[in-house]
Amino acid sequence: MIEAAAELRTVTVEREIAYPPEKIWRALTQPHLLQEWLMPSDFAPEVDREFTFRGDWGSVGCKVLDVEPHRALSYTWGAMGLESVVTWTLTPTPKGTHLRMEQTGFRKDQEQAYQGARIGWRRMVEKLEQVIAEDASAV
């Protein structure tokens, strides 16, 4: 079991964002904002809630694992044979927030999914930053 876990890979994206954690949290948890930078979904920040991200190519089945408002959010991510966990961590800094996104659970035989996530999450986090900047109704 320990060997299997050691073989799993993780995609990590980190950014310093010039907004408070509350504003970033809003973009991570409000479906109308999630749709702008990630995908449409029926997400709600409630532990054990099952939800689906929907894209033109298919869907991603998810379940909320952890919710610490304005600090951390974690959910499963299941699509096309990939069973992984996405974790968002928000740490306040003097200039805003340090955002860290990790997707853990890529097996060695899932190279295409791993590389796709490496590229895709970077793009999604860039879009997330744009949505945060444009969200005038937030903190």
Predicted regions and their residues:
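Residues at helix-coil transition
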Residues: 29-30, 39, 69, 126, ...
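Hydrophobic-ligand binding "helix-grip"
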Residues: 39-43, 52-100, 104-107
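A generic structural micro-feature
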Residues: 5-9, 56, 80-82, 113
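Hydrophobic pocket/interface hotspot
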Residues: 24, 34, 51, 64, ...
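A conserved amphipathic terminal alpha-helix motif
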Residues: 105-139
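Hydrophobic ligand-binding cavity/cleft-lining segments
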Residues: 1-42
